[in-house]
Every structure is written in C-alpha cells, then in structure tokens.
Amino acid sequence: MKLIIFTGLVLFAIVSLIEAEEESGRVCIPLNGECSKSPDKCCDNINCDCYLRFEKGVQAGRPCFCTEKDVIFERDE
C-alpha cells in the first residue's frame, strides 16, 4: 500500500515539474509552429506572424505561425 502511494506521489511530482517547465518559458515554438495563443513563445530569430482568414467574405479566424524574421510572404495568383 505504501508503495502505491509513493509511486502516485512521484508521478504527480514529475507531471507538475513538466508543466512548470513549459510555463516558465524554456520551451519555445519551432519554425512553422502555431503561436496563436502565445505569440511571444517562438524560438530565437523567429517571429509570430498572424493573418486574417475569411470564409465566404466573413472573418473566420486569425491563425498565427512562427516564421523566419524578415521574410515576406506574397499571395500567389
């Protein structure tokens, strides 16, 4: 019984430590990763760029992705 309780406490501590590390900012979003909820978490030398998305003339969201700095994307027609 003590072993089960000890194992549960150890697992809880490990999960808490992982969550604390993610919240502390050590984990960054890689290139082309979505950054809509945390635009300041892109890795070094990467910016969080957002664009408006429309469906049938109505705004349907604002997705954001980590992209290279000083890179400009143009619409291909």
From Swiss-Prot:
Expression sites by tissue: Expressed by the venom gland.
Coiled coil regions in record: none
PTM per Swiss-Prot/TrEMBL: Contains 4 disulfide bonds.
One Pfam family in the UniProt entry: Toxin_35
Propeptide regions on this chain: 21-26
Leader peptide range in chain numbering: 1-20
Annotated compartments: Secreted
Gene Ontology CC: extracellular region
Keywords: Disulfide bond, Secreted, Signal, Toxin
Single annotated GO MF: toxin activity
Cross-referenced CDD domains: Spider_toxin
InterPro entries linked: Spider_toxin_CSTX_knottin, Spidertoxin
Keyword Nucleotide-binding carried by entry: no
Similarity comment: family membership: Belongs to the neurotoxin 19 (CSTX) family. 09 (U10-Lctx) subfamily.
Protein name: U10-lycotoxin-Ls1b
